[in-house]
């Protein structure tokens, strides 16, 4: 199977090659702001067609496993969806969570309130309640859990992980949910707090496969939302000495994930991984791309090739909501090629102003925009990029490496263009290749061609760029 996606002024190609060549080759195209549709494919040839850049699937080898594409499910998104008629809500969820739409299979939950909640809360705001006698997830039952259960009905294969924005205020320096640090004398009670959350969700039929110690541990969001600051040493100590043992003692398979912040934090991650017990205690390193570049994590992946890495948050900015899908495809491909096995967006649904959020001032847009006036659900450009992966790449696929061969010709060099590529091998043996091409600003439109080699045959894929 072969799928190709085209868009105005840029080109994003997603290729699936099955095991019997032409009979299983299909081409799909998405034009700018349009729908994906199947188009006629070219023929495979036994001879190379010129000295082109080549995606050589015959030479590719396994890199690391693909764990899925996802989106976060904050209270704000669930509140907006709760106001819709049931069937309308189900239509939107099917668009996001099935392969007829974006094909997402991973959901990120917030432990307590986040910047995209209706108000600030935790699950135990009773000051000094070290026994957690007042612990309750009733706030999540208002909007979040009903939507989570509808997502499970739409796609029972969805997996969940969770991140906290802040411990209860009474556990922290300064007694404020916004900013500050967790008091060391409360590491134990906070680990038990996180365990109680995971158990409470389990009782609701929601299995939390992983938990990060803290969302963005080096950001206090200028006091605008729940946050908590952690040094690398504090985070590592909490995971190794408190959180991982508490999860094990409770009989939970949930794994702690390290960091959950930007690519520019590689030095901190290096130091944390060198701390005694960290590698044995964590299930992955989690990343955000708001600062730094995906390539910065490659040395960590090379040093620890069996340590999973995942992208846990990145969504559209409200001022750049219509940023083209190639920008997102480029980021995703570079992230996969740098060692991450999964990519999760930020808010599932927001309105056209990026609302609601806890302060009213945060600038994020939704994976899907729900217009507050018309009620229309508009997929973002990020959604359209996700769709080219989510429809075709299956959980457990190998993310391949060693497949790109630069051709020796002016045509291949394409000095005015930039090409990025990612390749996958699904559990059923089908091959998926995503190729992104874009011209330098001001360059004339002309064909962009890349040669795909599979089972000693060749296929030229072409699009206008």
Regions found by a protein language model. Give the residues of each.
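N-terminal catalytic cores of secreted or lumenal carbohydrate-active enzymes
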Residues: 33-208, 241
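Short acidic/His/Gly/Ser-rich catalytic and metal-binding motifs that mark active-site loops
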Residues: 116-120, 168-175, 217-223, 266-268, ...
């Amino acid at each position: 199977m072969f799928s190709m996606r085209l868009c105005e002024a840029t080109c994003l190609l997603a290729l699936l090659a099955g095991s019997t060549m032409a009979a299983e080759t299909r081409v799909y195209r998405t034009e700018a702001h349009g729908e994906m549709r199947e188009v006629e494919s070219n023929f495979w040839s036994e001879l190379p067609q010129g000295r082109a850049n080549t995606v050589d699937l015959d030479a590719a080898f396994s890199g690391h496993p693909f764990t899925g594409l996802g989106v976060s499910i904050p209270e704000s998104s669930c509140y907006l969806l709760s106001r819709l008629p049931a069937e309308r809500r189900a239509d939107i969820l099917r668009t996001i969570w099935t392969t007829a739409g974006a094909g997402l299979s991973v959901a990120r939950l917030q432990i307590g309130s986040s910047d995209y909640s209706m108000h600030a809360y935790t699950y135990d705001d009773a000051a000094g309640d070290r026994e957690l006698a007042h612990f309750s997830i009733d706030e999540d039952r208002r909007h979040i859990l009903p939507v989570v259960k509808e997502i499970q009905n739409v796609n029972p294969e969805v997996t969940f992980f969770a991140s906290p924005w802040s411990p209860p205020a009474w556990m922290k320096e300064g007694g404020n949910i916004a900013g500050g640090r967790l008091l060391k004398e409360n590491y134990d009670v906070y680990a038990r707090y996180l365990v109680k959350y995971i158990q409470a969700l389990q009782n609701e039929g929601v299995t939390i496969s992983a938990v990060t110690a803290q969302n963005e541990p080096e950001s206090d969001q200028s006091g605008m939302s729940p946050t908590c600051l952690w040094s690398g040493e504090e985070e590592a100590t909490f995971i190794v000495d408190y959180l991982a043992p508490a999860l094990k003692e409770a009989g939970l398979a949930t794994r702690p994930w390290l960091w959950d912040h930007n690519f520019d934090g590689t030095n901190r991650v290096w130091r944390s991984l060198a701390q005694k017990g960290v590698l044995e205690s964590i299930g992955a390193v989690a990343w955000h791309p708001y600062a730094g570049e995906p390539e910065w994590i490659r040395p960590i992946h090379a040093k620890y090739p069996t340590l999973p890495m995942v992208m846990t948050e990145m969504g559209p900015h409200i001022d750049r909501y219509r940023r083209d899908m190639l920008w997102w495809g480029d980021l995703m491909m570079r992230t996969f090629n740098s060692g991450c096995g999964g990519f999760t967006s930020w808010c599932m649904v927001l309105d056209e102003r990026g609302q609601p959020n806890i302060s009213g001032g945060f600038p994020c847009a939704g994976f899907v925009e729900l217009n507050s006036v018309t009620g229309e659900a508009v997929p973002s450009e990020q959604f359209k990029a996700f769709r080219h992966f989510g429809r075709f790449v299956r959980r457990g696929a190998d993310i391949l490496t060693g497949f790109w061969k630069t051709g020796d010709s002016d045509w291949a060099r394409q000095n005015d263009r930039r090409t990025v590529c990612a390749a996958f091998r699904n559990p059923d043996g089908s091959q998926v290749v995503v190729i992104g091409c874009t011209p330098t600003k001001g360059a004339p439109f002309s064909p962009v061609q890349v040669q795909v080699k599979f089972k000693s045959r060749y296929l030229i894929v072409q699009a206008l760029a």
